Structure formats: structure tokens, C-alpha cells
UniProtKB/Swiss-Prot annotation:
Zn(2+) binds at residues 340, 343, 553, 570. Residues 335-570 form the PRORP domain. PPR repeats lie at residues 88-123, 129-166, 167-201, 204-238. This is Proteinaceous RNase P 3. It comes from Arabidopsis thaliana (Mouse-ear cress). Its cofactor is Mg(2+); Mn(2+). Mn(2+) 2 binds at residues 481, 499.
């Protein structure tokens, strides 16, 4: 079969070389090919007695990988030019970062020594920060600790004498160096100076931690408490390591009231404690000082203790040590129903306290009103206060339902829509679970309610709910989220929704508060092959608990997902 000779653009026509050695000379190094030529590229076969040469028009520019010195030095190779023009300060910083990644302190110090003797390099804050960080990383290495501390302070002194103000990262590194040699006072002074200067660089927990932990290790309790007060004034929240250290130093120095305070802080901020913290708690209760602590008579006032527990939301009273005599410490498990298998006491499902709940409710009202004020006045919207008044009048509910979330669950298919049967199933299930046979309250947007009323298959049930105050229609232009969240918070009842309420977390109170509230009040649901399953709140909270009898239960962090396998410290008094 005879091949049809393709037509070539004139710019690409070339003669067949008489020998192979001339092929390189024949093909241009770079050929500009238009997009149309590239799209219509065809294989061309040129033949003579010595060579069969196959050329793609579109690949001719890439056939020669050899480059001349002129090509390498041309502006078309920006990387080499950029590398050649890199300034010495930037080169030093890159090399220091490389030392940090390799954990090579000796190499970093050698670079620093060379830099301070060079007239071409002016050290800046980034250089000093990188060096100080690397020095602080070796304070726990016995072979390099002394060098790291000594050279670290030399570097810091040069930084300050150069007129460079240390930022938070630099102060943190030097504070760690100071604490490593037992100078908690200097570590604390660095933080106080940083706060006094002000500006954009502010201290963090890691900035305070070296001084606080140093004072605790050296049993300088009062200085440790001073650091804590300074942290509190700066809005820094303690975490487990710091609280545990303060508890240890308080126990070691016989400050029983401080020990009680830090147990409460662990309950509030941590929940489950680590093995290390549990050992510190155990040592305190086994000690002589703990057995000498008495309740000063409050243990006999059961009504006072119960009222305090109720006010706090359950799980603690906060009035101080209760009982007399030695403590008995056991490690055991808690049943799925919340019963301690060591002492038979039932643990509480801890709720938010009255003050927190009231603040939460007020915040919801404020935000709902602000949203209303920002909306276009042309849109009809009933005042949120109308719902507040309605709820005050009819607010005898044990559960609130996010109607839209339930009705639209798993309805994202071709014929899917709002499922009233799903909503009805939840209403019936909660009614049957209610000991007092109370109906829940459904909150649903008015537009959705009107659509259901227009459907003859749904009208009777919806009208029945409205007449029995089981259904409240939120007004047009409103966000029904605020309504069901407000109702559940105000009535301190259950909230049935799968909504994670992440938006609310960021807009309302602290994340820790909202998580605690959700754990106690949110009911999640699923429908498996049409069958409803409600996931009720757990019967007890996995946090440190203090009972009205004076006993303590401390959950320990566990890798087991099965809650019944978690270890708990059960701490009771012989007289209780």
C-alpha cells in the first residue's frame, strides 16, 4: 500500500541528511509550533539509503536534551540565577532550618559562630529564633544539655544587645533554658517582661509552663500559685500537666485546700486523667495529711450538700472535704448503668450549672434578636419574644424536636421529600418513653407546616398537633435553629436532632460548655429499614465526680472503646 505523502509547513521542511552525523545539525533546537499545527501533528517518514527518520512536528523542540553553557546562563533558567543571587542572610536561615530538621545542634552553632565574625551577614529575629529553638530542644539530652543552655543564653544576650525585641517563640525557648537549670524566677521574669511590653506578641500556655513547672518541681508552691494568677489575668487556661503539677506541689507541702481546688479544676477542665495524674491523686489520699483533713461539720448537713449538688448540675458540691478518717482507694469499673462496682454508688449525669445555663439562654435570646434586627424589614417576622411568651405558658415538655432535621432524614433520593411518618414515629416513641406520658414539642418552619396542611393525607395529624400544642410553627424569615435550641436550654430538657450545631459552638459560649450541654441533652436518631432507634444521652458522665457523701470517683484515660472496661479510682472514707 502506498502511503500518501503528508503536506508539511514550509517552516518545517528539511532535506534528508546524507549521513547520521548530520541529523543533529538538521533538526533545530527549538521550533515554535502553533496550536493548530500541534493539534494536526502527523508522523512523517523520511527515507534514504542510510536512515529512516521519524519526526513528530510537535515533539521536535524536545528531541535534543543537550544544552549549551549559553542556555544554562540565560534568563530562561531562573533557578540557577536565583540560587546565585541568594543573599547570605537567607542562605544562613535556610541552613539553620535544615539543622533544626536534622536536630544538629553542633552544625547550627558552627554556622552562628561563622556568621557573627562575618561582615556580610546581619543576624535578624528569625536567625536568633531558630537558634534558640534548637538549643531548647536539647535541654533533656544529658550529653548536650550544658552546651545547649550556655550557648542559648549567649545567643539570647547577643539578640537583646543587637536591639532585637524577643517575641513569644524566643521567650518560650529561653524560658525553657532557664527552667532546665532550675532558674524559675528568670523564666517567669521573661514572661512578665513580654506582657509588660505588649504588642502583637502575647504569651501562651507554653510560655508560662516552664516557670510554673520549675517552681512545682522545686516545691516553691507560692511562686507556682503566683504564676497561675498571672496566667489567669492573661486569660490562659491551665491544662492537665500544669494542674497535675500544682496538685502535686500542694500535696507535698500539705496544703489540703489547694489540693481540693485542683481536684475540682481537673474535674472541670480535663475529664479523664492520665495514669501519671492518677498516681499523684492516689499518693495524696494515701498520705497522712489527707487522713487528718476533716469536714468541719458540713458532712452532717445533708440538705446543704444535696442543694449544692443540684445547683451545680450534679456530680459535685464544691463545699470542701467531707467525712473523717483514713481514705480507701480502689481501682475498678463502672457498669453501663453508672453503678460503681467497688462501692455500689451510682454516678451522676453531670449537667451545666444554673449560672452557665442562664447565661446560655440569655445569649440565645440576644443572638436571635440581633439576627432579627439585621434582616430586611420588608420581610414579615414575628418577634422572638412571642415564642418566649408562648413557651412560658405551655412549657411543660420533656423533649424538643428539630422537625426539619427529622423529617428530611435520608430523603435525598429521587422521590424523597419531607417525611411526616418519620416525625410521627419519633413523637410516639418519646411519648411512650415518658413516665408522665407527655408529648414532645415539635418546632417546624411555618412554610413547611403550611405545605403539610395542604396535603389531605397529612392535614388531620398536623392540625391535631397544633391544637394540642405539640407543634409550633416558626415565623417566616426566622431561623428555626434558635427556637429549638432556646426551648431545650430554657426547659432543661432533651433535644432530638442530628445537627452537630457547630455554628452555634462558635457563636455562643465556650466549646467545653457547649460540649457538656450537648452530651447531657442531645438525642440522636437513626431509621434502619424504617425502624426508629433513639440514641439517648449516657446515664452517667465520664468525669471526676464528688458525691454528697464525700467520696470521689476518678476516670482514667483508656485505649479501650468499651466504656465498661475503663478503670476508675474509687476513693471513699472508712467512716462513710
Amino acid at each position: 500500500m502506498k502511503l500518501k505523502k503528508p503536506s508539511l509547513p514550509s517552516s518545517l521542511l528539511c532535506a534528508v541528511p546524507p549521513c547520521l552525523s548530520q541529523i543533529r545539525l538538521l533538526i533545530p533546537r527549538r521550533v515554535r509550533v502553533s496550536s493548530s499545527t500541534f493539534a494536526n501533528a502527523k508522523l512523517v517518514t523520511l527515507r534514504n539509503h542510510t536512515v529512516n527518520l521519524h519526526i513528530y512536528y510537535c515533539s521536535m523542540a524536545g528531541t535534543d536534551n543537550r544544552r549549551s553553557r549559553h542556555d544554562d546562563e540565560s534568563p530562561k533558567n531562573p533557578n540557577k540565577k536565583k540560587k546565585g543571587n541568594r543573599n547570605p542572610e537567607k542562605s544562613l536561615l535556610i541552613n539553620l532550618h535544615s539543622c533544626s530538621k536534622r536536630k544538629d545542634l553542633s552544625a547550627a552553632l558552627a554556622l552562628y559562630d561563622a556568621a557573627i565574625t562575618s561582615s556580610d551577614i546581619r543576624l535578624n529575629q528569625q536567625h536568633f529564633q531558630s537558634l534558640l529553638y534548637l538549643c531548647s530542644a536539647f535541654i533533656s539530652d544529658p550529653s548536650l544539655q550544658t552546651v545547649a543552655i550556655d550557648r542559648g543564653f549567649q545567643i539570647f544576650d547577643r539578640m537583646v544587645s543587637s536591639g532585637i525585641s524577643p517575641n513569644e517563640s524566643s521567650v518560650t525557648a529561653v524560658a525553657r533554658l532557664a527552667a532546665a537549670k532550675g532558674d524559675g524566677d528568670y523564666a517567669f521574669k521573661l514572661v512578665k517582661d513580654l506582657v509588660a511590653v505588649g504588642g502583637v506578641s502575647v504569651p501562651r500556655l507554653r510560655t508560662y509552663a516552664p516557670a510554673l513547672l520549675c517552681f512545682c518541681d522545686t516545691l516553691e508552691a507560692e511562686k507556682g500559685y503566683e504564676v497561675e494568677d498571672h496566667m489567669d489575668a492573661s486569660g490562659i487556661v491551665l491544662e492537665e500537666a500544669e494542674i497535675s503539677a500544682l496538685l502535686k506541689v500542694s500535696a507535698a507541702t500539705g496544703r489540703e485546700n489547694k489540693v481540693y481546688r485542683y481536684l475540682q479544676k481537673l474535674r472541670e477542665c480535663v475529664g479523664c486523667v492520665s495514669e501519671e495524674t492518677s498516681k499523684a491523686i492516689e499518693e495524696w489520699f494515701y498520705g497522712v495529711k489527707a487522713s487528718e483533713v476533716s469536714d468541719n461539720g458540713i458532712g452532717s448537713d445533708i440538705e446543704l450538700l444535696r442543694a449544692a449538688v443540684l445547683k451545680n448540675g450534679g456530680g459535685w458540691h464544691g463545699l470542701g472535704w467531707v467525712g473523717e478518717g483514713k481514705w480507701i482507694v480502689k481501682k475498678g469499673n463502672v457498669s453501663s448503668a453508672g453503678k460503681c462496682l467497688s462501692c455500689d454508688e451510682h454516678l451522676a449525669c453531670v449537667d451545666t450549672n444554673e449560672v452557665e445555663t442562664e447565661d446560655f439562654v440569655n445569649s440565645l435570646v440576644t443572638l436571635a434578636m440581633e439576627r432579627k434586627a439585621k434582616m430586611n424589614s420588608c420581610e414579615p417576622m414575628a418577634d422572638f419574644s412571642e415564642f418566649q411568651e408562648w413557651l412560658e405558658k405551655h412549657g411543660d415538655y420533656e423533649a424538643i424536636l428539630d422537625g426539619a432535621n427529622i423529617g428530611l432524614y435520608q430523603q435525598n433520593f429521587a422521590d424523597g421529600g419531607f417525611s411526616l411518618p418519620q416525625l410521627e414515629a419519633v413523637v410516639k416513641e418519646l411519648y411512650n418513653k415518658s413516665g408522665s406520658k407527655k408529648q414532645p414539642l415539635i418546632l417546624l418552619h411555618k412554610k413547611r407546616v403550611n405545605a403539610l396542611l395542604e396535603n389531605p393525607n397529612h392535614r388531620n395529624l398536623v392540625e391535631e398537633w397544633i391544637n394540642n400544642n405539640v407543634l409550633y410553627a416558626t415565623p417566616p424569615g426566622s431561623n428555626d435553629d434558635w427556637y429549638w435550641l432556646y426551648a431545650a436550654a430554657k426547659l432543661k430538657c432533651l433535644l432530638v436532632t442530628n445537627d452537630e450545631m457547630r455554628d452555634h459552638i462558635f457563636e455562643l459560649l465556650s466549646n467545653s460548655f457547649f460540649q457538656k450541654w450537648k452530651e447531657r441533652h442531645q438525642v440522636r436518631f437513626t431509621f434502619v429499614k424504617g425502624c426508629l432507634k433513639l440514641e439517648m444521652p449516657p446515664p452517667f458522665s465520664v468525669v471526676i465526680q464528688e458525691s454528697e457523701k464525700g467520696s470521689w470517683h476518678v476516670p482514667i484515660t483508656s485505649q479501650d472503646k468499651e466504656e465498661s472496661l475503663r478503670s476508675w479510682m474509687c476513693i471513699t472514707r472508712q467512716s462513710s
